[in-house]
Amino acid sequence: MEKFKDNRELNRRSVKDQLANMELLADCIRAEEENGNERYNFLLKGYSQETKEHKPDHAACSAIKEDNSPNKITEKRICRCMNYYSKELAQCKNCKLERKFQNAGKNYFAAEYEVPTKYVIHRVGRIDLVIKDARSGVEYAAEINLPKKNSETLTRMIAEILTYTAGMLDKYKPAICFFEGSTQYKDFCNDAIRSDENFQYLLTQVDVFYITYTENDGIVDYVIHNHKEEPLW
């Protein structure tokens, strides 16, 4: 049985297809609520869930070596660097990663990355990044994409993070996060998408963060913004 988030149709990129998929996801959530079920039950259908609890198992960053593709940028590498980077740390000074990500903001910061679901669930991955509000202490579990060369749709991002946080909503608020200028950023600002009633409904289910950044001498100074506080539209 195909899992909702793994449906290839969710990544169709035309605006017409994106709007149709947003309607599909929104209708599924509404139907669960109307039937008195947990909102995101349908996202877990077809998964085998064990009672064994997951525990984060990644070690502290030990720096990227010269022979380990230092110019390769992946979601995991970005999130790990956002979580650990400090220009004062010896491993960061010795790290060969071509671009290092340094938080230049005050309100939000990366608190953890690659967080597993509460229980082992077959074929369900990990939460990319935990974003923490430095003022309130609220933590957001965020699905994040690369700044460039990533065509994932907003619907797929929302479906993924709602899948990963099912059963963890007492700890994390689900969110999506994208970089300024990315494909997802442009989709979010698209007039037809942002005015769609189903998309507006989905935005009541997740928070939205966007990242602005500047790069100088291999250091990416980034700031995490909350769309509710600093609206893009």
Regions found by a protein language model. Name each.
Residues 1-233:
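Charged, terminal alpha-helix-loop-beta segments
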